[in-house]
């Protein structure tokens, strides 16, 4: 646990950084929700998934990570829409309930998104601007892989007093590491992932295990992609590992549902 801007508590578990912990949870929560919703055989396992889901959701709130909050909102919106879209008819009541139960610090943090007078927001914007200036010269092949290469090139383009180990954006960091080809390769991998989960969704009925899990994977990946605009989501190897597990699971589920037979 750490303190942020006065008396605001931010949790980070074993990840040393609240944003990294939030990204980890952002990928786990949709899958946990799918396991909870599809568990029909054991009430104990269902209860376990339910408790895990509640604790994970609470932990995301206390990371105070605005990018992860936006990612979770996007992931939840996609999941709810395709799992049970009728829930949106009760949206006003849900919003009211959130206002009643959420701490004021959550709404204060959310309202600061895009506010350049906020220290954290301004810090990121200046890093992005410095990185973009750098990439004007290195967009074809990047500056090299890793923090070491970034740390050598970035200071020549950084704004005064704005030091950073990375670009605080997955997409800018990909171009920094390997240029436009790296960004294109990542885009192709992501599109392949969404192709897999789109195929698997609805196989065996929209409430089948494979369908719900494919929906959860797609929702989690979309939320993760949104968070990638605000931070470098592959900075921690554990988060990166879960991303590639997502990709592997999407391919495995498509194969098990018959999608690999004509490829």
What are these regions (language model features)?
Residues 1-7, 13-82, 90-97, 101, ...:
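Alpha-helical transmembrane segments of multi-pass inner-membrane proteins
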Residues 199-211:
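Membrane-interfacial, low-structure loops and terminal tails that flank and connect transmembrane helices
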